Amino acid sequence: MNLIINDKTASSSVGQTIGKAARLNHAHVGYVCGGHGLCQACYITVQEGADCLAPLTDVEKAFLSPRQIAAGGRIACQATIAKEGTVKVLSRPEEVRRMVFSNPFQLIGYAADMGKDTAQQIVPGVQNLIGRIQRGEMGGKDALGDMIESIQGAAGLVVEAIQQGPMALPIPFKEQIADLISKLPLPQIQLPSISLPQLPSISFPQLPFSLPKLPFSLPFLPQQPQATASLEKVTITVQPPAKD
């Protein structure tokens, strides 16, 4: 069996799931839910050899959208190798990692599509999960063994990636991402200057009549100061009449 995961050859056999083969070969495929198909961290895109895999399981039909299925999407922990041949797949973590280093702008549309697919399959996914819980398919020794195997596979992937160098790590360093973003030709956005319009002056019209003066003062109106009369000193001189 010729299985190629993320452009790397992985040893595998008929009857084995791609997820199990990926764990045993420390391939860059997500390991979270222990093979129950819940997290979709092991989502893969089959690039070649889809006819060598078994048909979609009920779990895949519940959690994968029609768009993902049409694009060759499978869940690695559910996709079983049915016959000999060449199968080439690309995992979601590796696909995202390549986008970060090649064309980060693709991540916007990629994330939007994945979010739409997830929202579209919430109801059938939950129904499938409830059915498996009722049938007792979510526990037992097999589930514990799958979980332990997933942890061991993830640890082996990290150790192997560190030995190969930083570029092989599943998640790029934040320093690398920051350096990449700083080199992107992002356009400078200049905000336009906004000038507020001048408000027109408002003049109240003159009343055609004058209000009568009240004989008393209102308590809420300020008292007008009364003008004080100024006294002027006047000298009167009386002269007696002249004699004839």
UniProtKB/Swiss-Prot annotation:
Protein name, entry field: Chlorosome protein I
SUPFAM superfamilies given in the database record: 2Fe-2S ferredoxin-like
Gene Ontology BP annotations: photosynthesis
Residues annotated as binding [2Fe-2S] cluster: C33, C39, C42, C77
GO molecular function list: 2 iron, 2 sulfur cluster binding; metal ion binding
Location relative to the cell: Chlorosome
Function: Could play a direct role in the oxidation or reduction of the quenching species formed in the chlorosome.
A Pfam family reported for this protein in Swiss-Prot or TrEMBL: Fer2
Cofactor notes: Binds 1 [2Fe-2S] cluster per subunit.
Keywords: 2Fe-2S, Chlorosome, Electron transport, Iron, Iron-sulfur, Metal-binding, Photosynthesis, Transport
Major localisation: other
Signal peptide: none
Domain 2Fe-2S ferredoxin-type, first and last residues per copy: 1-95
Source species of the chain: Chlorobaculum tepidum (strain ATCC 49652 / DSM 12025 / NBRC 103806 / TLS) (Chlorobium tepidum)
GO CC aspect terms: chlorosome
Aminoacyl-tRNA synthetase keyword on record: no
InterPro entries (UniProt xref): 2Fe-2S_ferredoxin-like_sf, 2Fe-2S_ferredoxin-type, Beta-grasp_dom_sf
Disulfide bonds: none
Essential cofactor(s): [2Fe-2S] cluster
Record has Iron as a keyword: yes
Lineage, broadest ranks: Bacteria, Pseudomonadati, Chlorobiota, Chlorobiia, Chlorobiales
